[in-house]
Amino acid sequence: MHDIRAIRENPAAFDAALSRRGSAPVSSDILALDEARRGKILAAETAQADQNKASKEVGAAKARGDEAEFERLRALVAEKKAEIAAMQAEAKELDTQLSELLAGLPNLPAEDVPQGADEADNVELHRWGTPREMDFAPKEHFDLASVQDGMDFETAAKLSGARFVLLSGAVARIHRALAQFMLDTHSEQNGLTEVNGPVLVLSEMMYGTGQLPKFGEDSYQTREGWWLIPTSEVSLTNIVNGSTIAEDYLPRRYTAHSLCFRSEAGSAGKDTRGMLRQHQFEKVEMVSVTHPDHSDAEQKRMLRCAEGILEALGIPYRTIVLCTGDMGFGARRTYDIEAWLPGQNTYREISSVSTCGDFQARRMNARFKPADGGKPQFVHTLNGSGLAVGRCLIAVLENGQNADGSVTLPQALAPYLGGKLTLNTDGTLN
């Protein structure tokens, strides 16, 4: 959500920022609705003052026996009451229209975000690790001999349809180990508070983080009205929904491992094989709630937390900053981390780390109380994958593959796998 006062003060700057995201200028429409709404509110207040004045005079007219004046004033009070109700209803309708217009507009990009139309204009910041040279043709994860029994797409399709997978045996254990390793790292080393939250949330929570109203088709809703979360960002960020937090309570840093659900609307034909794009998947999420002065530094901190997971696993990656045309709806700035997948001979996204400024906080009405006793201000919110567990499994399998189809697993997983770091071609660990 956007600050209407900032739009009033500098509508040209607002339109210019929107244009960087490819959106048409809309400040004139916003200000027209705002002016009409404020006009109705002022008219209702004026009518209320007239009604109050007439109400006081009714008693005086009655006391002095002026029946004609008494009746005139009574009629005036009733007339003003009807006027007030009508103007308040009109103001409410205009307020709804204004809120709906503002709710459909994306966040404004930070000044340092590169200008661009799509992913081709994203800017690489740095790389870590060197892709391993293999003296054989590397395979994609789903073709490896060692996962043929443990990564079952056929049975999953029988159970649920396309874009699902059934993991079993050692592959399921490695998947679980990765999630546990991420959670332990974030909670024990990176200082995040572990949360186990609901995966079913109210519409208000989806609105708070920006999934609604514009992107409802991307998620699943139950008959009872709950939404299945597309990411734990929804559950974690909305912990502060409707709250006013003491400044010394900031920053709040959360992490959670959860199931996530996405309809993948608009993704027909993309990544139809394997685990890269699923309707149901698992992710370890990071969320920070900060003072506005500290959000840029916090984003870099979160980025390092996510990058550190890949470094510990020995997975080569590159980090890019998304251009204005490729950022998500609620983001002010986004860094993507892409892991090297030798089976595809390319880097693929495994994490996005975004700062949203006060965009989500305004939708959630989440504020903090300054330590100096000043007026409450909106917090800043940030979110990032730390990491997508299924995609991390893909990266571990493909980067650790051997010529015979077995996989050498990262040393970091040894404590979670009983020290067994070889996934054999028969699907066993040793």
Curated annotation (Swiss-Prot):
Keywords of the record, alphabetical order, are: Aminoacyl-tRNA synthetase, ATP-binding, Cytoplasm, Ligase, Nucleotide-binding, Protein biosynthesis
Q: Which GO terms describe its cellular component?
A: cytoplasm
Give the EC number(s) listed in the UniProt record. Answer: 6.1.1.11
Q: Which compartments does it reside in?
A: Cytoplasm
Q: Kindly indicate whether the keyword Nucleotide-binding belongs to this entry.
A: yes
Q: Which GO terms describe its molecular function?
A: ATP binding; serine-tRNA ligase activity
Q: Per UniProt, what is one Pfam family of this protein?
A: Seryl_tRNA_N
Q: Where does ATP bind?
A: R262, S263, E264, E349, I350, S351, S352
Catalytic activity annotation: tRNA(Ser) + L-serine + ATP = L-seryl-tRNA(Ser) + AMP + diphosphate + H(+); tRNA(Sec) + L-serine + ATP = L-seryl-tRNA(Sec) + AMP + diphosphate + H(+)
Mainly localized where?
cytoplasm
Q: Which cysteines are joined by disulfide bonds?
A: none
Ligand binding (L-serine): T231, S232, E233, E285, S385
Which pathway is it part of? Aminoacyl-tRNA biosynthesis; selenocysteinyl-tRNA(Sec) biosynthesis; L-seryl-tRNA(Sec) from L-serine and tRNA(Sec): step 1/1
Q: What does the UniProt record say this protein does?
A: Catalyzes the attachment of serine to tRNA(Ser). Is also able to aminoacylate tRNA(Sec) with serine, to form the misacylated tRNA L-seryl-tRNA(Sec), which will be further converted into selenocysteinyl-tRNA(Sec).
Q: Which HAMAP family match?
A: Ser_tRNA_synth_type1 (MF_00176)
- According to its record, what is known about the domains? Consists of two distinct domains, a catalytic core and a N-terminal extension that is involved in tRNA binding.
Protein family (similarity comment):
Belongs to the class-II aminoacyl-tRNA synthetase family. Type-1 seryl-tRNA synthetase subfamily.
Q: Under what name is this protein listed?
A: Serine--tRNA ligase
Q: Which organism is it from?
A: Ruegeria pomeroyi (strain ATCC 700808 / DSM 15171 / DSS-3)
The organism that produces this protein has a lineage beginning with: Bacteria, Pseudomonadati, Pseudomonadota, Alphaproteobacteria, Rhodobacterales
